[in-house]
């Protein structure tokens, strides 16, 4: 469904989801931060949720990206609500999550788009948005490695999942990512993303 469209009651679908998610997370303390997550539209009715669980022996660290404001502290200016009597819930997810057993480390990369700070990098060019998004992902991994600047990161990306707002963009985005991330498995899905002006969102897993 169109996550930024407003149903009959007038509120944005994605904001409704954020409001309910905020209420749920407020019932407990999240010592390891919020989950790495992607909230995305679907081409069918209803809601589908999947998640991974790990044992208590696994170290879990929330990851921030200094190019992007943490979504769970977004200002009201970028949250769309048409219910003046209701506090806007922020998107409760971390930019990424590091899971480590002291022998290997896996990074779950949340759904990432062409956002810097909390503002969309607005353009009609899906390739430009794709490359800004990939830069954001690479920078997130670079911060986890303690590096200020990144060399090529493709060898450390295990997989990517790309959500495209417009099905017609699939071929050119695939050609672009084949060049930027050679050898990385990429799945392409047609789905709506969280802001009307954004054309692509990418999530993934990196193995360090």
Q: Where is each model-derived feature located?
A:
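N-terminal presequence-like segments and the immediate start of the first folded domain
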Residues: 1-2, 6-208
């Amino acid at each position: 469904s169109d996550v930024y469209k407003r149903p009959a009651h007038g509120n944005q679908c994605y904001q409704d989801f954020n409001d309910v998610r905020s209420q749920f997370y407020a019932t407990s303390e999240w010592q390891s931060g919020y989950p790495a997550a992607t909230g995305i539209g679907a081409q069918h009715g209803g809601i589908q949720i999947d998640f991974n669980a790990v044992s208590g022996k696994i170290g879990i660290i929330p990851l921030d990206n200094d190019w992007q404001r943490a979504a769970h502290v977004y200002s009201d200016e970028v949250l769309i609500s048409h219910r003046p009597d209701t506090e806007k819930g922020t998107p409760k997810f971390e930019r990424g999550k590091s899971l480590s057993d002291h022998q290997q480390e896996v990074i779950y990369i949340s759904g990432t788009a062409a956002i810097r700070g909390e503002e969309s990098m607005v353009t009609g060019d899906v390739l430009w948005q794709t490359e800004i998004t990939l830069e954001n992902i690479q920078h997130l991994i670079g911060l986890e490695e303690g590096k200020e600047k990144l060399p090529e990161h493709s060898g450390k990306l295990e997989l990517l999942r790309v959500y495209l707002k417009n099905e017609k963009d699939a071929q050119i985005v695939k050609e672009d990512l084949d060049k930027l991330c050679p050898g990385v498995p990429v799945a392409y899905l047609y789905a709506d993303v969280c802001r009307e002006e954004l054309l692509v969102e990418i999530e993934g897993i990196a193995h360090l």
